[in-house]
């Protein structure tokens, strides 16, 4: 069985763009190191990309969060910093999932495809802990009842550290590993 690392939305707009925040920038090297280690150890890696179109403000999410961001194929949509190298690399153990909102209903199917079935273990990291990380963690936890699902707490961030911590407590209470 495969092990899976999911890097959630580590994109320019969440680090130094429209919705950027200081804590996100500090994650660049630690996330890069985790991705490199995972690939070297034979893990599968999925990068999610928040992906919107020009009509974002007319969507339900755009009404809730009226800040245009991660418009497909703009600079803000691409992975941030050193992680951007993976967008131009071809690797059989890696894939991208473009998602139109906080959580991706396609993520479990993508994980099965990449892993050749249900992953044995899943780790998540990225941003924003209390929005997209938690949404995708719950989708994966619900889809893979035999998989351990863990959040890499030091490789996730939210603009408000209290939101980050309260989300980790919530996930811990639902049986997720917080490592």
Language-model-derived ranges and their functions:
Residues 43, 145, 176:
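Short phosphate-binding/catalytic loops that engage adenosine nucleotides
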Residues 142-151:
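Acidic, Mg2+-coordinating phosphoryl-transfer loop and its flanking beta/alpha structural elements
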Residues 87, 111, 115, 143-144:
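Active-site catalytic pocket residues across diverse enzymes, especially alpha/beta-hydrolases
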Residues 31-37, 134-143:
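Histidine-anchored nucleotide/phosphate-binding helix
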Residues 1-95, 116-117, 150, 159, ...:
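Active-site acidic carboxylates
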């Amino acid at each position: 069985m495969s092990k899976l690392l999911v890097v959630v939305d580590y994109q320019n707009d969440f680090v130094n763009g429209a919705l950027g925040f200081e804590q996100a920038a500090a994650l660049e090297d630690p996330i890069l190191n985790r991705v490199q280690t995972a690939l070297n150890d034979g893990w599968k890696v999925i990068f999610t990309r928040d992906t919107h179109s020009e009509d974002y403000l007319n969507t339900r999410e755009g009404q809730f969060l009226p800040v245009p961001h991660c418009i497909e194929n703009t600079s803000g949509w691409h992975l941030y910093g050193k992680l951007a190298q993976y967008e131009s690399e071809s690797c059989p153990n890696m894939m991208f999932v473009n998602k139109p909102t906080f959580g991706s209903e396609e993520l479990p199917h993508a994980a099965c495809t990449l892993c050749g079935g249900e992953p044995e273990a899943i780790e998540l990291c990225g941003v924003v802990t209390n929005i997209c990380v938690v949404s995708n963690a719950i989708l994966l936890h619900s889809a893979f009842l035999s998989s351990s699902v863990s959040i890499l707490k030091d490789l996730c961030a939210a603009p408000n550290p209290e939101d980050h911590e309260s989300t980790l407590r919530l996930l811990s209470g639902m049986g997720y590993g917080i490592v």
